[in-house]
Amino acid sequence: MSKPVIRDIKVARKELEKEMIKGLLDYVRNGVFPHNSPNSYMNAYTIVQGMADLGDPESELLFNYYNNTIQGFIEDCYKLIAKESSNQLIDKFIKLTENINFLIYWMSRIFTYLDRFYTKAKSKLTLCESAMTSYKVHLFDKIQHNIYIEVNKLIKEDRNCNTESRNKIKIILKIIYDIDLSAPKIIKEKNKICWIQDGGVSNRDETQYQDVWFDKYFQSETNKFAKDKANADIHNMSAPEYIISQLKYLDEEEIRQNEYINPKYKSKINEINYRFLIGENAQELSKMDTGIPYMFNTKRNEELKKTFQLFKLYPQSLEVITNAFQPYIKKRGEEIHSNKEISKDPKKFIPELINLKREMDNLVAECFENHPQFQDKKNKAFSNFMNKEIYSKQLSNYTDFCMRNGFKGKSAEEIENTLNDIIGLFKCLNSKLLFQLESNKKMSDRLIKNVSLSTNTEKNFISKLKQESGVTFVNKMMEMMNDLEKNKKEIDAYKLSASKGAPNGIKFNIQVISQSAWEINKKSMEKIEMPKFMTACIEDFEKFYLRKHSGQKLIWCLGLSKLDVQFLYLKNKNIAITTLPQFLTLLQLEKYENISIGKVAEILGCQVSTVITDIHGLVFNPSYNPKGEPEKGVIIGTFDAVKKEFKENDNISINKNFTVARQKFNTLPLAVKKSQAEIKENELEEAQITKRYQDNILQATLTRIMKSRIGQTTTHVWLINEASKQIDLFKAQPQQIKENIEKLIEKNIIKRSDKNKSCYDYIA
């Protein structure tokens, strides 16, 4: 049988206190657990429901009773804590807040019926909102200053490795967080009473109380702590110790932030820590005896790695590391260059540079995580010390060595790695144009002499250069490779002609190449007087070729020809690989027995210097005369045997006592040491060729720029700067750009502006 509805507030209060509220208050005040009956809660809830159903006046009386009960207890709590010492304040505050929450939880459950209709209809605060407001006004607002100070003390202890107070910190900051809830709701979860944001209300990110704590208290405390720590550590630790200490502290700080700091403040806390622990002391770390330059010079990679891990947290400080990194690379590179024994030999010089490049690449990858800033500084450092012509020339020489015999016996993977290393250094060259010119020349020589180990490797290298610098850069190289393929088809067709590719029974092989692509020494194009059986071979091929390619002209590079010549007068009838001038010289010696070098040149119709070069191979080629003994050459004569010098008036003759162990040997001329005058002449010629190419590139670039700016104002200074930016094959100097601007004006491609003589216009 149900109880009658209570209609009087005084009676209702008395019954509510009897059923549950008196017991709750006794518990939160004295810790005496209430001995209510199992039905006490339902009885109390039913009383509230019955009274509220009577109408608004009764509901309002119940609402006021709810608020007054909670407020009264909170005010009593304030009296208990108001004069509490700082040592006991936090513990007392936490305990009282737990009691308040306990009371609010059960009171809100008893009176929850009011939230269904009354508080909504009257636009009043919910029971939980009203209780939280009372907590703020009558307790927290009055003691928040002291609470903020005390919680900061606890955090300072935590930062000083005393983690015992961490749980208290979490509780206090959770209380502050709860106070800021825009729609607070108290619940019981896993036997623990806690506040949450009401899921039925939009969550406004309000942090009023948290902001007061952070902005007015904690931020300045963090500032002071970080500053003091940085100052103490920098004066009492070595650079590596300092780095490790800060990394450890920041790791611990992140744990603290994750455990009890609102994520909203994380960036501000980090900014303070990074500024003092990293930014303020970065330069000092570099200056220390054990600092960043020392780490580089002594290859302390693990220390550099940790330094980067710290400094990357404050990116503007990375410059301190890169400012030490760039000079370090430059110093290492210049040490290699200054070692004359190494730098003169491309087979030693370039591998040393490759090893340095690999080492720096690995350093950037392993210690600096391939950070773009370090990649950029590394590349600039290499470009900075590789700004001399020797680097372009020696890299080209090394590539030539690899293609001729350096790759012999190497695996495909080893060859690929070496090619990539060469390209890696190529990227750093200031004068890529010089490398291009030298490489074209050397590739031409390899392919003509058929001394390249692999055309596939040649093609692979061309492909890598093309990928790096574009198709224009490798035009000549590609054309040379195309010529080889076309020539193979041409020779196959010639072998099917009437002479079968062997006129008069002489096996005859020809390379047809385009003059525009190949680097051919003009001396090799000199006409040479030949016996009829040889001219018949040339005439036979010309007849075949010009029948297919009418209108074209063949220029014979006889100076590049090689022959297999058998020495019938020798006991073993040995065979020698000779040049055409060498063979023709031997024919003259067979005819005249003894003849001057000048006379041979006259008969052959070529320069004396050409004959001397070839005679040198007939006497001193190490394939048959390793000790360079003049009496053991294919020919002998009156030349200077000590200096190994030949003159126009020196007489030569066949050495009939010549012997050689090999059945087939080589008499091809070796590079003869040039005089200083010849060296200077060659250098001047190369410089002129290089400048001519540079001027062509500059004029093409300037024309392209001006053509794209028709109708726009182009100043002299802007044009020079823009041209300098766009040219990457060499470092264009302002004076050189200016000279080519004048050349374009002379060619009527551009003109000075009528309105302003310091500006230029394109002549359409």
Please tell me what each predicted stretch does:
Residues 1-764:
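Eukaryotic scaffold/interaction segments
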